[in-house]
Every structure is written in structure tokens, then in C-alpha cells.
Curated annotation (Swiss-Prot):
Keywords assigned by UniProt, alphabetized: Amino-acid biosynthesis, Cytoplasm, Histidine biosynthesis, Lyase
UniProt-listed PROSITE patterns: IGP_DEHYDRATASE_1, IGP_DEHYDRATASE_2
GO CC annotation terms, alphabetical: cytoplasm
One Pfam family linked to the record: IGPD
CDD domains registered for this protein in UniProt: IGPD
HAMAP family in the record: HisB
Bilayer-crossing regions: none
Protein family: Belongs to the imidazoleglycerol-phosphate dehydratase family.
Species of the source: Laribacter hongkongensis (strain HLHK9)
A single GO BP: L-histidine biosynthetic process
Recorded catalytic activity of this chain's protein: D-erythro-1-(imidazol-4-yl)glycerol 3-phosphate = 3-(imidazol-4-yl)-2-oxopropyl phosphate + H2O
The name this protein goes by in its record: Imidazoleglycerol-phosphate dehydratase
Length: 197
């Protein structure tokens, strides 16, 4: 099974992420950031990734450190679980609509971290959640999962819908990229022979 557990403790946050890339979308969260948990649930359910995440952070200041560090820890767990990447599809993409909103996510498990994030939210907050923190989450993830990730919200009026289409598409793109390719069994999907940058 491709699974991993990572604990990351700093003076600002204490976070544990357990994931199973070959799961069924089961999820349990205790982060103190409800809207983020709603988005993480989209990753689990649409990516068929089992996620168990606990986080304690300096939420008396704001959610910035918790959200960013959660992205970092999730990226570390993902990198550990995916291993040497032999026999996987490597690339993943998805378009996901929700009513008026439409987002596209494309990723490459390349070993080279990079984020292209093109989202213009129609509001600065969703409930009490600062939408700027989504970018921090994805930056943390790509820098520690060592993936290239392109996120484009193509249209949307409702900020909740914009965010939800992004996270659903991210989950589906991950599912595609990590899926074993029976024609590539035991083979690294790169002409370089490695996907470690």
C-alpha cells in the first residue's frame, strides 16, 4: 500500500497527516479551520485518497500558519507515499464545474516543484476564511511533494463554488497521476530514468 504518516511540529503549529493513495476517500479532520476541512474532504473523496489530519495552530492570530503548514505536511506525506514513482501515469488533469464555476487543474509528478495559480475570487473571504490562504496551501504542497501544479479558475461568481471546483479538480488530477499504468509496470515514466528533479 502506498501510504505514509508525517508529523511536523514547529513553534506555530503541530500537524499530523496520514494518507493512503490507494484508499476509498475516507477522511477525518481536526484542524480548527472548518472551511479548509470542507476543501480537504474534496481531495479525499474525488482523489480516492484516505486522509486523517490533525492540526493545532496559532489560530488566535489567524489561520495562515495552520493552512500553510498543513500544505507542507500533506506534501511531505504525499512524497513519502508515492515513493520512486515507478509504474504510475505521472500526469493528471481535470476540469470540474459547479453551477456557474469551472476550474482546471493539471499536474506533473515531475520532481520539480512549481505552482501556477490563477484564481480571481469574487470575495476576499468565504465565511471567515481568507481566500489568499489557498495559494499558501498549494505553495506548501508543491514545494514538499515536488510536483508541478497548474490551477486555473476559468469562471465563477460564487467564491465557495470557485474554491470547491479547484479542490475537486485537484483531487481528480491527483487520482489520475498516481494511478498505476499496467503498460509501465516497474518503469519510471521519464526519458531521464528518474523523477527526482
Amino acid at each position: 500500500m502506498r501510504q505514509a504518516t508525517v508529523t511536523r511540529n514547529t513553534l506555530e503549529t503541530r500537524i499530523t497527516v496520514s494518507l493512503n493513495l490507494d484508499g476509498s476517500g475516507q477522511a477525518r479532520f481536526d484542524t480548527g479551520v472548518p472551511f479548509l476541512e470542507h476543501m480537504l474532504d474534496q481531495i479525499a473523496r474525488h482523489g480516492l485518497i484516505d486522509l486523517d489530519i490533525t492540526a493545532q495552530g496559532d489560530l488566535h492570530i489567524d489561520a495562515h500558519h495552520t493552512v500553510e503548514d498543513l500544505g507542507i505536511t500533506l506534501g511531505q506525506a504525499f512524497a513519502r507515499a508515492i515513493g520512486d514513482k515507478k509504474g504510475i501515469r505521472r500526469y493528471g488533469h481535470a476540469y470540474v464545474p459547479l453551477d456557474e464555476a469551472l476550474s482546471r487543474v493539471v499536474l506533473d509528478l515531475s520532481g520539480r516543484p512549481g505552482l501556477e495559480y490563477h484564481v480571481d475570487y469574487t470575495r476576499a473571504t468565504i465565511g471567515s476564511f481568507d481566500v489568499d490562504l489557498f495559494s499558501e496551501f498549494f505553495h506548501g504542497f508543491v514545494n514538499h511533494a515536488m510536483v508541478t501544479l497548474h490551477i486555473d479558475n476559468l469562471r465563477g461568481i460564487n467564491s465557495h463554488h470557485q474554491a470547491e471546483t479547484i479542490f475537486k479538480a485537484f483531487g481528480r488530477a491527483l487520482r489520475m497521476a498516481v494511478e498505476p499504468d499496467p503498460r509501465m509496470a516497474g518503469v519510471t515514466p521519464s526519458t531521464k530514468g528518474t523523477l527526482t528533479a
